[in-house]
């Protein structure tokens, strides 16, 4: 996967326009470490609290399909999500965001309704993460993100804000056009 990230970054592979744009600082640093062979792929991501952009969250969705079709247990899903996220974003806050998102997608792949999928991710075991980290996702895991007003949803590059916005939009719109154009 890290090799493919490098192909994307260096050669614009997998892009719609044959141009790379808006690569985050954390992703850039991680890919540089990997390219210079300074670390194993899963150890290249920064793990400080200031390295919690949404880069790994934006790339993690294919892992949901893999885990679903392999019928993996939650502990194995967390391990894979952690390893893939850690290529660029190794902090537990970003890993948890990716895990929540992957689990939500898996619930949808199982045929659950949006509401049931959302309720099911709130019931998962998050004890592999500190209470402080889990509490950063309080509006998703302990409250109901879909009930917030649009003005209360932030649109930033911070992983928590991005996941909140993603779930809010998905839970509050019915069509693609409504979600994108709003």
Predicted regions located by residue number:
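Structured, active/binding-site neighborhoods that engage oxygen-rich ligands
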Residues: 1-182
């Amino acid at each position: 996967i890290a090799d493919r990230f490098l192909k994307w970054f260096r050669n614009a592979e997998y892009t719609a326009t044959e141009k790379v744009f808006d690569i985050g600082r954390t992703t850039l640093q991680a890919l540089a470490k990997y390219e210079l062979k300074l670390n194993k792929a899963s150890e290249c991501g920064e793990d400080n609290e200031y390295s919690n952009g949404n880069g790994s969250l934006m790339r993690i969705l294919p892992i949901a399909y893999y885990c679903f079709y392999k019928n993996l247990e939650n502990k194995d899903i967390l391990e894979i999500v952690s390893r893939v996220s850690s290529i660029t974003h190794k902090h537990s806050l970003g890993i948890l965001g990716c895990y929540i998102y992957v689990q939500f997608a898996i619930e949808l792949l199982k045929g659950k309704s949006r509401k049931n999928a959302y309720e099911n991710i709130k019931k998962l075991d998050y004890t592999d993460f500190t209470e402080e980290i889990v509490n950063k996702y309080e509006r998703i895991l302990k409250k109901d993100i879909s009930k917030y007003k649009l003005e209360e949803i932030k649109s930033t590059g911070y992983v928590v804000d991005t996941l909140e916005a993603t779930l809010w939009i998905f839970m509050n719109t019915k069509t693609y056009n409504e979600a994108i154009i709003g």
